[in-house]
C-alpha cells in the first residue's frame, strides 16, 4: 500500500484547509456505511477518504453538496429528515406556559420556594 501524501491530495482540492474538511466529511460518510470508491485495504475511514481524494474520486464539491448524504438517509432508516420531522410533529417543541406557574405553586405548597429572603420561614 502506497502512503497517501498531502501533495497527492492537493491536486484535487484548493488548499490544506479544504482537504481537512473534505476528508473529514468523507470519512464520516464511510464510517456510517457508504460504499468506498477505492479498495478498502484494512484501513481506517480517514485513510480511505484521503485515498479517494488523492485518486480524484472525491473533490471539494463534497463540501457544497446540499442534498442529504446517503449515510444520513441510512441512519434514518431510509427516510428523509423531512419525513421524520413530519411524523413526529415537525417544528420545535413549544413550552407549556402553565408549567412555571404550576411549579411555583408546588414549591410554595411544600416549602421549597426559593428567593423568599427569610432564612427561617417559620418566624
Swiss-Prot record:
GO MF annotation terms: DNA binding; DNA-directed RNA polymerase activity
A cellular-component GO term for this protein: DNA-directed RNA polymerase complex
Gene Ontology annotations of biological process type: DNA-templated transcription
EC number(s) on file: 2.7.7.6
Pfam families: RNA_pol_Rpb6
InterPro entries attached to this UniProt entry: DNA-dir_RNA_pol_omega, Pol_omega/Rpo6/RPB6, RPB6/omega-like_sf
Region annotated Disordered, chain positions: 67-123
Superkingdom to which the source organism belongs: Bacteria
Keyword Transferase included in the entry's annotation: yes
Reaction it catalyzes: RNA(n) + a ribonucleoside 5'-triphosphate = RNA(n+1) + diphosphate
Keywords recorded for this protein, A-Z: DNA-directed RNA polymerase, Nucleotidyltransferase, Transcription, Transferase
Entry-linked HAMAP family: RNApol_bact_RpoZ
Family (UniProt): Belongs to the RNA polymerase subunit omega family.
Job of this protein: Promotes RNA polymerase assembly. Latches the N- and C-terminal regions of the beta' subunit thereby facilitating its interaction with the beta and alpha subunits.
SUBUNIT field: The RNAP catalytic core consists of 2 alpha, 1 beta, 1 beta' and 1 omega subunit. When a sigma factor is associated with the core the holoenzyme is formed, which can initiate transcription.
Protein name: DNA-directed RNA polymerase subunit omega
